[in-house]
Amino acid sequence: MGNGNSALLGTDLDKFEKIRLKRGGKKCYRLKHLCWCKGELDRFGLSDKLLETQQGCEKILSVCWPLYDQGSDNLKALVGTVCVVACIHAGIEIKSTQDALKKLKVITRKEEKQEDESKNFPVQRDAAGQYQYTPISPRIIQTWVKTVEEKKWKPEVIPLFSALTEGAISHDLNIMLNAVGDHQGAMQVLKDVINEQAAEWDLTHPQQQPAQPGGGLRTPSGSDIAGTTSTVEEQLAWMNMQQNAINVGTIYKSWIILGMNRLVKSHCPISITDVRQGPKEAFKDYVDRFYNVMRAEQASGEVKMWMQQHLLIENANPECKQILRSLGKGATLEEMLEACQGVGGPQHKARLMAEMMRTVVGQSQNFVQQRGPQRGPVRQPTGRKPICFNCNKEGHVARFFKAPRRKGCWNCGAMDHQKAQCPKPAQQQRVNFLGYGPWGPSKPGNYPAQEVTPTAPPLEEKPLQKTLSTYQKLGRGLRQKMKEEKREEDFHSLSTLFQEDQ
């Protein structure tokens, strides 16, 4: 195979022979490598003429590139050679085979990304400036149906629906709603909301009667926006008018999201006022539950801000509430989470105990300093000394007596009983109930020496109390009299049973 049949000629062939086989190596490409490449293409059923153009090299790579990672050494060498030839056709400067592989990988990834973006948006503009409609991808529909089956109607379903239907028209939105097989009750609620919004649209945007002259577009009605009485071409025309364009897809999407908000509210029976932190619940988990329920609340931003500033603090447990109140009103959520981190754990309880002990010790020290030193001599106890029941001596007790323990009764000395069962009176005088104290055997000084006569005048008796006491006395007299009469009757009745002695 001569030079006339080569895929590269002239300066391109000179560039090809300057590129190294490996990065940092000494060997470069030669004409024999192109001949070997054409022979390998025959094995794949590809024409060797594809190497003569850049588009032909891209077709070769589209066939061989998916097999590159799991392919043999010959396949990897073929892909590397084709990449080098493609870079020379495209005018990309490279020095080795690895550089060619990297350059083409970057270009391939950019093209795939552009294709993915074009699939996600149904309405696209071509090179001539005309709008073209691409049906919604089945992958998006599958993602939406799977999310509804798993999440039901939780608050996070609404942002996902909004992201999946970016730039969609009413026809695509109806396809998304009709793909939901279950939850037909929720779908009926959604239809009712759409009908209400369509009726309100018809009242605020009356249609022109008769239609616009010259065969122009009519003003869309509520049913046209919902996609029931309009075609795909009409929806595209309304969205892309030069003047006064009406984006029917965005309007219909806002109606659907309004109905979804009502579904989320009905499927979330917990009110935001009922979300309270448990005694052992972490503050982070409580915040997650609080904001999850708050997403389902249909309220304005000001109301939700008030909920965050007041309800989040008031519904916390006492420990977190005390910490949050100490932060002040202007505390952010990040500061709250950082302050309440670890509340309820052993470290937090130990820290609270240490603070309480430090406070108590400080208060006692302040009290001693304020009281000052004690004035006057220290008062010593003057009571009698304790008596040992083992040796009958004063000054110590039997527990600390070193002599052997005395047996028998400690009161009379008998061996057949103990002191507690001794029938003889105690030889020593017993201690009073106040025990030994500084007052000695006599009564303490706080006992009054004699009864003090009150100097205040006696309380006046109220008439009602006086009458009540009088009736009580009369009642007691009547009860006593009735008891005596019963006794006399019993006596007379008993006398009738016996005859008089004859």
From Swiss-Prot:
Domain of life: Viruses
Matching PROSITE patterns: ZF_CCHC
CCHC-type zinc finger segments: 386-403, 407-424
Keyword GTP-binding: no
Short motif (Nuclear localization signal): ranges: 26-32
Matches recorded under InterPro entries: Gag_p24_C, Lentvrl_matrix_N, Matrix_HIV/RSV_N, Primate_lentivir_Gag_pol-like, Retrov_capsid_C, Retrov_capsid_N, Retrovr_matrix, Znf_CCHC
Post-translational modification remark: Capsid protein p24 is phosphorylated. Specific enzymatic cleavages by the viral protease yield mature proteins. The polyprotein is cleaved during and after budding, this process is termed maturation.
Motif (Nuclear export signal): 16-22
Keywords in alphabetical order: Capsid protein, Host cell membrane, Host cytoplasm, Host membrane, Host nucleus, Host-virus interaction, Lipoprotein, Membrane, Metal-binding, Myristate, Phosphoprotein, Repeat, RNA-binding, Viral budding, Viral budding via the host ESCRT complexes, Viral nucleoprotein, Viral release from host cell, Virion, Zinc, Zinc-finger
Region of interest called Disordered, as start-end residue ranges on this chain: 204-226, 442-502
Similarity comment text for this entry: Belongs to the primate lentivirus group gag polyprotein family.
PANTHER family: ENDOGENOUS RETROVIRUS GROUP K MEMBER 24 GAG POLYPROTEIN-RELATED (PTHR40389), PTHR40389:SF4
Task of the protein: Matrix protein p17 targets Gag and Gag-Pol polyproteins to the plasma membrane via a multipartite membrane binding signal, that includes its myristoylated N-terminus. Also mediates nuclear localization of the preintegration complex. Implicated in the release from host cell mediated by Vpu.
Descriptive protein name: Gag polyprotein
Organism field: Simian immunodeficiency virus (isolate GB1)
